[in-house]
Amino acid sequence: FTESLEIAFTIKDVDLKNPANRIQEEVRLPAGRGRSVKIAMFAGGEMATKAQAAGLEIIDPTTIEDLGGNRQKARKLANKMDFFLSEIPHMGTVGRYLGIVLGPRGKMPRPVPPNLDPGMMAAGLSDTTIVRSRDRMTFHTAFGTKDQTLEELTRNALAVWNRVIGKLERGSMNIRSCYIKTSMGPAVKLEVVS
């Protein structure tokens, strides 16, 4: 078990009841996540072959309805995977049957156009972390693992920090506190200079 490193933000003076003020960002980490990412794709035919060659887990579109009927199995799949992709024709079916499970987790599939290689999309997602505040003043995200060097972790943490600051109306003035911690370790408070 390799511990992840997380950065936690507590923000202030932001009205999160207004959805426009909520933070929902995908941040590309310059030094990668430090671990492999599990990506599944709803695909059939040639697209499924391409996705399988890229190392993605394939979910047959004919099983979407069955997954929707078995909520426990759908939850297990949603928790196991980091990201989902889907061929465009299957997006409606996925939304109808699995939206109730994938939506709240922020894991609705990204559509893959017919002319795009799913491996390229998966490669982009492998270095991505999601920062999501929902309606809470405190939120956190993983930005690396203990196996990475201090320089890599610093670059990743700065990428997340800059994206969050960029989304806040008053930048660092809206940050009450910021902590960095390992999965199992104590939190270390960062000094926020306004």
Give a label for each model feature.
Residues 1-47, 70-71:
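Translation machinery proteins
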Residues 43, 143-145, 182-184, 192:
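Flexible glycine-/small-residue-rich
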Residues 52-57:
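Glycine-rich phosphate-binding loops that contact phosphosugars or nucleotide phosphates
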Residues 135-140, 183-189:
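A structural signal for small-residue-enriched, beta-sheet-centric alpha/beta enzyme cores
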